[in-house]
Amino acid sequence: MKKVLLAVLLAGVTLSATAAQTIRFATEASYPPFESIDANNKIVGFDVDLANALCKEIDATCTFSNQAFDSLIPSLKFRRIDAVMAGMDITPEREKQVLFTTPYYDNSALFVGQQGKYTSVDQLKGKKVGVQNGTTHQKFIMDKHPEITTVPYDSYQNAKLDLQNGRIDGVFGDTAVVTEWLKDN
């Protein structure tokens, strides 16, 4: 599978230091280490740090909102927000809807399941694998592995919980995010 690319999507935001402005960013904040919500109910992570650095550079103020992943592009198109800062693959379909910056992070994807239960994708035939709704991970499984039942989730956090509780057999997600999960489990 093509490596995952993270990108900033911009809609009508002129990134110049000529006038102080507020840039309204949206993300799906259950995606550590890129985006998550801390103990103070604040959105934090790599993408937030990058957005804040961008705002500092252009003398703007950043605000962040948490939304379902599959609502990010519609929110941008309807100008409810100014930019998306989230782990989002650049695809031809998405490029028809929004503008992307140059990618700033490459990532791969992997399956994770109960320890020692599955050692190959072939063993997931007929099994339920969680994916985040609207992602290229979902499309990849549906297109390349129709023998696997995809279970869409609004967040990878909910897929992780269902995996831990035995309601699904695996999760297919970004390597960096899954690695963060495995640190805690």
Describe each region flagged by the PLM.
Residues V48-D49, T63-P74, G116, V151-N165, ...:
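Short helix-initiation/N-cap motifs at beta->coil->alpha
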Residues T101, G113-V129:
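Flexible hinge/capping segments at coil-to-helix
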Residues E28, V98-L110:
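Short Pro/Gly-enriched coil loops immediately N-terminal to beta-strands
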Residues M1-A19:
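Gram-negative bacterial Sec-dependent N-terminal signal peptides
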Residues E35-I37, A51-A60, F100, H137-D154, ...:
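Ligand-binding cleft/hinge of the Venus flytrap
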Residues A20-G87:
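Extracytoplasmic small-molecule ligand-binding "clamshell" domains
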Residues A26-Y31, S65-D70, R79-T91, Q114, ...:
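Beta->alpha turn/N-cap motifs
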Residues P74, G87-K96, F140-D143, Q164, ...:
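A ligand-binding cleft/hinge motif common to bilobed small-molecule-binding domains
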